[in-house]
């Protein structure tokens, strides 16, 4: 069964390029992004892993840990990293999980429970559903799920934008409108009454409709 927003992220132990981890312990009190790819040494994923390495400092600034996953063994990840650095200018600077028995991919709903457990015999096409992005909060719950086809590279700048929104709305009773970026106006959450809103926003708000109350972004 696919994971839904607010589900608890399944915990697991796994070998990674940076040693063995238990996922929930590894997250600690941080946010996390787990992103998966169907096979090492594939073209689109090569560009994705390189770009993620390039912008990882932006995730660091937001207190977000990054971890990748594929069904290939960890030693394959290490070899692939050389190609990624050569072609993209950046080598992965975050751990990569080797899900060789497919157990994590199954637990996270990326592969069916009946999938063949021998990863070495599986092709990228067999694993094409293993192209997900999950954002996990400090409470270990799923905050975002994105699924991409093999032919479409992921937009990690959009993941950063969503994390900005998630972190802001976790602290303040607001929502972010279409195409919102950090620093732009936000919407007072519908669960907040006008009376409560007046206490939080004594300068008032713009309201083109009673249900659409617009205010400057609160300071963190």
PLM regions: where:
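Chalcogenol-based redox active-site neighborhoods
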Residues: 1-220
């Amino acid at each position: 069964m696919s994971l839904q927003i607010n589900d608890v992220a399944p915990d697991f132990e796994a070998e990674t390029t940076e040693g063995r981890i238990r996922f929930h312990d590894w997250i600690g009190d941080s946010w996390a992004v787990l992103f998966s790819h169907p096979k090492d040494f594939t073209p689109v994923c090569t560009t994705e892993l390189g770009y993620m390495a390039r912008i990882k400092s932006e995730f660091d600034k937001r207190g977000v840990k990054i971890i990748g996953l594929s069904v290939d063994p960890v030693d394959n990840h290490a070899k692939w990293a050389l190609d990624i650095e050569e072609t993209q200018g950046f080598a992965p600077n975050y751990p990569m999980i080797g899900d060789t028995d497919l157990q994590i991919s199954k637990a996270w709903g990326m592969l069916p429970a009946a999938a063949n457990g021998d990863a070495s015999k599986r092709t990228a096409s067999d694993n094409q559903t293993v192209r997900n992005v999950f954002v996990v909060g400090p409470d270990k719950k799923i905050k975002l799920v994105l699924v991409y086809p093999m032919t479409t590279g992921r937009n990690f700048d959009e993941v950063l934008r969503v994390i900005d929104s998630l972190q802001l709305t976790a602290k303040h009773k607001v929502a972010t409108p279409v195409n919102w970026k950090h620093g732009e106006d936000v919407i007072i959450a519908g669960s907040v009454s006008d009376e409560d809103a007046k206490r939080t926003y004594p300068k008032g708000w713009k309201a083109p409709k009673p249900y659409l109350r617009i205010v400057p972004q609160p300071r963190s």
